[in-house]
Amino acid sequence: DASMGGLGADSVWTEATIKELRRELADAYAGRTVLVTGADGFMGSHLTEALVELGANVVAFVRATSSGALNNIGHLRHRLRVVFADLTDKTSVDYLIRDLATARDRPYVFHLAAQAHVGESWHRPYETVMANVVGTLNLLQSIVDHGLELEKLDTAGTSEEYGNVREAGA
């Protein structure tokens, strides 16, 4: 698999291989503008920390809370830009995207913000649709509305998106 330094599923991750992969990733992300939505969540915080370590100029989009606390990326606060806002509020998303449009490079966007707990989605369907569908739509529409040219946009999902797959049909 060329996207992982030639490593396939059966490859051994040696220290040298990991070092080479870090070098390749640093070449790709060092000094580059990167937006991470959901940056203080489980996946987002790990990605944000890795990108900061690689030298990226990270813009961490974090849901505004009454406390303003950063639970998972607080230790990185001096090494990145944090934007507290709500993806379901198109105006705040527009503000962010307008600002990103002034970046000297084409930003990478990792859209990880979501209501990710499946059980919670059954108990709070409206909030789930707002966060996962409307929030994503607002982000994408703002990118289009402001003519933001991206290097790449990646989103994350879960296996739950596919439903239950019977073994025979898999």
Map each language-model feature to its residues.
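N-terminal Rossmann-like NAD(P)+-binding domain of SDR-like oxidoreductases, especially those catalyzing
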Residues: D1-A170
